[in-house]
Curated annotation (Swiss-Prot):
Job of this protein: Associates with the EF-Tu.GDP complex and induces the exchange of GDP to GTP. It remains bound to the aminoacyl-tRNA.EF-Tu.GTP complex up to the GTP hydrolysis stage on the ribosome.
One Pfam match: EF_TS
A GO CC term assigned to this protein in UniProt: cytoplasm
Protein name: Elongation factor Ts
InterPro entries in alphabetical order: EF-Ts_dimer_sf, Transl_elong_EFTs/EF1B, Transl_elong_EFTs/EF1B_dimer, Transl_elong_Ts_CS, UBA-like_sf
């Protein structure tokens, strides 16, 4: 255990929610490299994958405004030190003025915001004056400012607790469908607020990310299967791939031929293969795109109809409305995401259990 500090074990536990001794062993195994220890735990199926954002202490609000014509929208994350201050009327006024300034000066970054004028002085001066009045450090941490070109609609959703906000842009072709597209965008934004997709589409993933996530996923399924086997329950299929970006034309053609060879070996007449193979291919794709189903907006199953993915919902609306709909932008803010939880007096407890 030489060189592995109690603080490092605590940090790994906060990041993964794995057991303390598992964290200790992982750090020893990888010579104290935190990122490698996280990967080690995930590949062993020991990480409970607790998101850092679920464990942070940052307070404040996520606020957004969608203009009445649904052609632009602003969203901002403003952090305070305590929840009490976030509910303060002075803080609420600061949030309102922040959105107004973003809108008035076409701002897209926090740097632009701080330099922008408000009441004949830089916004940064106004912010400092409010920090002095309110008595806590306040940070404008993130800004999203979306603009919609012709035949695009922007809508969004902010959770009532002001801790999550989502903006969605949808492209459409038929102007008469605009009101329905507005409603669809809001419903999908509500879905994303609840289900936390990381990206819009699997194309937004890197191959390295997918391979790493797939290893962790396989370890998780194998661990679940051990318990299922013990209880006499059906086992889950172990995937070869994790995302649609791995399923090249060559991979799909190879799998189709494998299914056809299997049917041939079973003595099934070739004339019925076309009725069997598509269903097998559909199941193969579903089993081998689990990362997409978990982490992409288009790949997730819709909370209002869990038999359809978001992509299928959009396709069905396109067909029903005689239109061609495409989600072109997706932005999700969650309060404090990526900020580490304030250190607690926990290192001593870890140290005692490591002796």
């Amino acid at each position: 255990m030489s060189g592995i500090s109690a603080q490092l074990v605590k940090k790994l536990r906060d990041l993964t929610d794995a057991g303390m001794m598992d964290c200790k062993k992982a750090l020893v195994e990888v010579a104290g490299d935190l990122q490698k220890a996280i990967d080690f735990l995930r590949e062993k199926g020991l990480s409970k994958a607790a998101k850092k954002a679920d464990r942070i202490a940052a307070e404040g609000v996520i606020a957004l405004e969608v203009v009445p014509d649904f052609k632009s929208a602003m969203m901002v994350e403003i952090n305070s030190e305590t929840d009490f201050v976030a509910k303060n009327e002075g803080f609420k006024e600061l949030v309102k003025k922040t959105l107004e300034t973003i809108k008035a000066h076409n701002i897209h970054t926090t740097e632009e915001l701080l330099k922008s004028p408000l009441d004949n002085k830089p916004f940064e001066e106004y912010l400092h004056s409010q920090i002095a009045v309110i008595g806590e450090n306040i940070l404008v941490r993130k800004i999203a400012h979306l603009k919609a070109p012709s035949f695009h609609i922007i809508n969004g959703y902010a959770h009532s607790n002001a801790r999550v906000g989502v903006l969605i842009t949808i492209k459409y072709d038929n102007e008469k469908n605009a009101p329905k597209v507005v409603e669809l965008a809001r419903n999908i934004a509500m879905h994303a607020a609840a289900m936390k997709p990381q990206v819009l589409d699997s194309k937004d993933f890197s191959l390295d990310f997918v391979k790493k996530e797939t290893l962790a996923l396989i370890a998780e399924i194998e661990k679940d299967n051990e318990e299922a086997k013990r209880l006499g329950k059906p086992l889950k299929n172990i995937p070869t791939f994790g995302s649609r970006i791995e399923l090249s034309d060559e991979v799909l053609a190879h799998q189709k031929k494998a299914f056809e060879d299997e049917l041939k070996a079973q003595g099934k007449p070739e004339k019925i293969w076309d009725k069997i193979v598509p269903g097998k291919m559909e199941r193969f794709i579903a089993d081998n795109t689990l990362i997409d189903q978990r982490l992409t907006l288009l790949g997730q199953f819709y909370v209002m109809d869990d038999k359809k993915t978001i992509a299928q919902v959009v396709a069905d609306c396109s067909k029903e409305w005689d239109d061609h709909l495409t989600i072109t932008e997706y932005v999700r803010f969650e309060l404090g995401e990526g900020i580490e939880k304030k250190a607690e007096n926990f290192a001593e407890e870890v140290a005692l259990q490591m002796k």
